[in-house]
């Protein structure tokens, strides 16, 4: 422990204090912590206290954190990749979630969020994508506690406004939108970075419809690099830049798919699609030309008739 009065690491049932004095940063090594998994969402409480010169506490903050490691590995001679959490394969059984209340429209109450996530857990849903904007903090707190993976999505969505035939595509590949897109992505990341349930960042939804240059004039490339440099511990996703669209994934033979050398060449870490048929998913998995692990971003839209024709 850097600058600490007690170098012993805490266990799940214990408590240790770090006295930093005038120091502003600290590194704490926790030995053999209980890991966070969806089935065993072990959490630790981190408490920070700010004291004045007399030792009086003038501000205190507390937040849960969990210990788990997200990464990708090559799984065969073709170097196709797999997402893993602390050595175990990740399989998503997930849903997209919008803030939607029968009584209040988009102004959902805390209790409605609690009911949503408890219902998901009861029906073996283990993942949620916050389509298409950051949610209230209680959702991420509950996901930490209940053991639900979260793909956190930034508030960037424009649909037809992103088409290149517009005078000013929004944002599309127009470099004038780099700063706003970066701002929305990094604000989300800084707000939510301590949540164990968040395993990946999504830069936005359906906001590009043309092939854009992979450089900092393209807002989603700029977001990808900023997110990677600030938080290389999580997966990155943007469905409009999936491997199947432009075939732009780059990885040297034998390279570590989770290494910064590989990831800094690429805008996403996973392949994601919308509304595929089952045969298309199978075809992607069997095609050894595709390397990225697969994330089915959207499948059956419930707007309007609420799955009324799902069977058909």
What spans do the regions from the language model cover?
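Secreted/periplasmic carbohydrate-active enzymes, especially glycoside hydrolases
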Residues: 1-134, 142, 146-147, 184, ...
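Substrate-binding/catalytic cleft of secreted carbohydrate-active enzymes
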Residues: 127-312
């Amino acid at each position: 422990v850097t600058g600490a009065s007690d170098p012993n690491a805490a266990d799940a049932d214990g408590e240790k204090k770090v006295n930093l004095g005038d120091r502003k940063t600290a590194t704490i090594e926790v030995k053999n912590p209980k890991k966070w998994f969806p089935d065993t969402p072990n959490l630790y409480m981190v408490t920070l206290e700010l004291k004045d010169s007399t030792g009086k506490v003038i501000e205190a903050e507390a937040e849960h954190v969990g210990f788990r490691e997200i990464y990708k590995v090559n799984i065969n001679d073709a170097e196709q990749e797999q997402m893993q959490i602390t050595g175990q394969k990740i399989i998503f059984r997930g849903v997209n979630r919008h803030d939607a209340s029968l009584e209040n429209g988009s102004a959902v109450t805390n209790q409605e969020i609690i009911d949503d996530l408890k219902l998901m857990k009861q029906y073996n849903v283990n993942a949620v994508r916050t389509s298409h904007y950051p949610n209230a903090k209680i959702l991420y707190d509950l996901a930490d506690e209940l053991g639900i993976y979260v793909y956190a999505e930034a508030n960037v969505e424009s649909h037809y406004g992103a088409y290149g035939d517009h005078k000013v595509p929004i944002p599309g590949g127009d470099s004038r939108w780099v700063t706003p897109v970066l701002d929305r992505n990094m604000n989300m990341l800084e707000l939510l970075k301590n949540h164990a349930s968040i395993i990946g960042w999504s830069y936005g939804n359906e906001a590009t419809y043309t092939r854009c240059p992979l450089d900092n004039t393209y807002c989603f490339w700029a977001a990808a690099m900023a997110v990677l440099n600030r938080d290389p511990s999580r997966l990155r996703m943007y469905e409009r830049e999936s491997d199947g669209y432009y075939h732009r994934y780059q990885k040297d033979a034998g390279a570590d798919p989770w290494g910064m050398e590989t990831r800094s060449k690429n805008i996403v870490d996973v392949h994601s699609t919308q509304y595929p048929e089952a045969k298309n998913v199978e075809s992607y998995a069997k095609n050894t030309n595709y390397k990225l692990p697969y994330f089915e971003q959207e499948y059956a839209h419930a707007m309007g008739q609420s799955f009324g024709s799902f069977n058909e």
